[in-house]
Design a protein with these regions (language model features):
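ER-lumen resident redox/N-glycosylation machinery signature
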Residues: 1-148
Length: 148
């Protein structure tokens, strides 16, 4: 995620504290960066950023087109948008597929999260991406009574 801003722009100044809070609260979960378009016009043009502040979320790398965030400039809203875009390598484990999960890739250790959440936690998504080559991540939701 990148914030494109100009240090002397009033709207950019308004978002600064919220973006800093976002970076602190989501440390280790989201990669958060910023580019001053006054200092680096070429980079801003490369990403087709012509007005500031602009927040762009990238899923895998900066080579993809990214998606512009157009919602509320409050750190929780921005974080919610970005975490929905995160890649996840977490398998949903059910009573029907748990054997396949444990038999898949026998050389890898398996991590299972038992949760009451209806969606995968951002930190678990981040861990699954970070360790996808070494570990298999699975999630068992509370509706899977047979597995609990």
């Amino acid at each position: 995620m990148i914030l494109f801003y100009k240090w002397n722009d009033e709207e950019s100044k308004k978002i600064k504290d919220e973006y800093r809070t976002l970076a602190e609260k989501m440390y280790g979960v989201l990669k958060v960066g910023a580019v001053d378009c006054q200092d680096d016009e070429e980079l801003c043009e490369e990403f087709a950023v012509y007005s500031v502040p602009t927040i762009m979320v990238f899923q895998e790398s900066y080579s993809d087109d990214g998606e512009r965030y157009t919602g509320n400039i409050e750190w929780r809203s921005i974080a919610n948008f970005a975490t929905k875009k995160m890649q996840s390598f977490v398998s949903i484990v059910t009573g029907e597929n748990y054997k396949q999960f444990f038999e898949r890739e026998p050389t890898k250790y398996k991590i299972l999260l038992f949760t009451e959440r209806k969606t995968t936690a951002p930190i678990f998504k981040a861990l699954s991406k970070q360790y996808k080559d070494k570990l298999l991540f699975g999630e068992v939701r509370k509706s899977e009574i047979d597995l609990i």
